[in-house]
């Protein structure tokens, strides 16, 4: 059953308390209840922006390199139903001043027919592809996968028929709560297969990359160099912001698209 407007307004008001909510997931009983109710069966992948990535494919086969945006385009093209939100819940709740609040998520699958029409609209394949492209041009990072939380707050189910494509900013993304979440939930949000983020010897420890750039605060300066910890989800923002081009993001194989199709397709039926 689709959610009324007042329900979403309450969520927007509660959004600033998301970090407290995340810490509750570490309590033994409460954490399991939250996981089952909001995150059961989830598998969510952050996709680095195309311009940040180096494909480690053989030189004689450059055509085989698949950019991360192609993964998003593939699922949009395959879906029978496509929905574009008129707003981003995260940016609305955080009153974002940097990125467009009106650039909302894309949802795919039959469950979108249950979303309140006041929140967005059904779109054609081309309209969805254009929306995704606008989001990329605005500097937003895609996240794709099954996210039961979206099914719950939208009242659109079952979650097995709702594929989420979020367009995330570093300042407002809900998943900035990852460092506070229990491992059980935290590990359901991962980087794209094969992604490696490396700080090179060109780093001078200026700290630019650690100043509100990483949405999970995975990078910091230790002594004279930047250090990336295990919470990194490979979004590539630090690569873009580094003034010395000292951070590199690469993919260590050229079969990203087949791997992502194989991983996501069994999770959500978008036919």
Task: Specify the residue positions occupied by each region the protein language model found.
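General detector of N-terminal leader/presequence modules that precede the first folded domain
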Residues: 1-120
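Local cysteine-cluster metal-coordination motifs and their immediate loop/turn environment
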Residues: 86-100, 163-176, 201-216, 233-244
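Compact structured core domains
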Residues: 119-151, 156-157, 163-169
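Residue-level detector of anion-binding/catalytic polar loops
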Residues: 141, 238, 248
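Ferredoxin-like iron-sulfur electron-transfer modules
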Residues: 148-165, 184-234, 248-258, 267-271
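N-terminal cysteine/histidine-rich coordination modules
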Residues: 261-262
């Amino acid at each position: 059953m689709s959610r009324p407007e007042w329900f979403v307004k309450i969520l927007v008001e509660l959004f600033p308390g998301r970090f407290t909510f995340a810490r509750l997931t570490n309590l033994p009983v409460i954490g399991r209840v939250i996981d089952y109710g909001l995150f059961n069966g989830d598998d969510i992948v952050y996709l680095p922006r195309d311009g940040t990535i180096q494909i480690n494919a053989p030189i004689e086969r450059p055509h085989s390199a698949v950019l991360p945006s192609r993964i998003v385009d593939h699922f949009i093209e395959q879906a029978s139903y496509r929905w574009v939100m008129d707003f981003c819940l995260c940016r609305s709740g955080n009153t974002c001043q940097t990125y467009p609040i009106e650039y909302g998520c894309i949802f795919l699958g039959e469950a979108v027919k249950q979303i309140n029409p006041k929140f967005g609209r059904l779109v054609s394949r081309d309209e969805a592809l254009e929306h995704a492209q606008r989001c990329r041009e605005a500097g937003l990072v895609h996240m794709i996968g099954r996210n039961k939380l979206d099914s719950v707050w939208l009242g659109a189910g079952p979650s097995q028929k709702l594929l989420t494509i979020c367009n995330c900013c570093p300042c407002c993304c809900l998943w900035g709560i990852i460092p506070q979440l229990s491992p059980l939930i935290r590990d359901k949000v991962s980087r794209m297969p094969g992604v490696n983020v490396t700080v090179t010897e060109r780093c001078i420890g200026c700290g630019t990359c650690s100043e509100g750039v990483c949405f999970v605060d995975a990078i910091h300066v230790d002594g004279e160099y930047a250090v990336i910890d295990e919470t990194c989800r490979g979004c590539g923002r630090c690569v873009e912001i580094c003034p010395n081009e000292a951070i590199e993001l690469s993919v260590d194989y050229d079969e990203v698209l087949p791997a992502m199709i194989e991983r996501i397709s069994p999770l959500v039926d978008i036919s």
